[in-house]
Design a protein with these regions (language model features):
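Acidic, metal-coordinating catalytic segment for phosphate/diphosphate chemistry
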Residues: 1-19, 90
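Conserved Nudix-box catalytic region and its N-terminal flanking loop in Nudix hydrolases
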Residues: 27-65
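A short coil-to-beta-strand element that immediately follows conserved catalytic motifs
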Residues: 70-79
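NUDIX/MutT-family hydrolases
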Residues: 99, 110-142
Length: 150
């Protein structure tokens, strides 16, 4: 193990994050990560929940920070856990991600440095993309929440 690996700070608890399957005119916004975690993969915009912030407030803030869009969180659409380990089995990252179904309210996509690209796609048209694990299922569940809330 190198000195860099030994000096790396490992988490002591899971990191709580939110994401948003944002729907506009029957399409969902898919973004490609520009850096780790999930570098180069398509996923949903989102990020960490700050102390004192509700989950819905975190969704609104993270989406605005990453995409410049204004959204309305509709409902929780499931959960996802992402755990990565180093070669020795130590936990490098442990995310608990709560994806929300959300409606687009206003704005046009303008990405921050965390994201490389964004596309509005049909919810059923994700299979040709390299995505984070379970993205298709999350988008399907989110679409069901959007339709049920009409």
């Amino acid at each position: 193990m190198s000195n860099d690996e030994r000096s790396r700070t490992y988490p002591t608890r899971p990191y709580l994050a939110v994401s948003a399957a944002i729907f506009r005119d029957g399409q969902v916004l898919i973004v490609r990560r520009a850096r780790p975690p999930a570098h180069g993969l398509y996923t949903l915009p989102g990020g960490g929940v700050e102390l004192g912030e509700t989950l819905e407030e975190a969704v609104i803030r993270e989406v605005r920070e990453e995409t410049s869009l204004d959204v309305e969180p509709v409902a929780l659409a499931g959960y996802r856990q992402a755990i990565t380990r180093d070669a020795a089995g130590g936990v490098e990252r442990h995310f608990v991600i709560l994806p929300f179904a959300a409606r687009w309210i206003a704005g046009e996509v303008a990405l921050n440095e965390e994201l490389a690209e964004a596309h509005w796609r049909e919810p059923s048209a994700l299979s040709d993309l390299q995505t984070t694990e379970g993205l298709g299922l999350i988008v399907s569940a989110a679409w069901e929440r959007i339709m049920a809330a009409r």
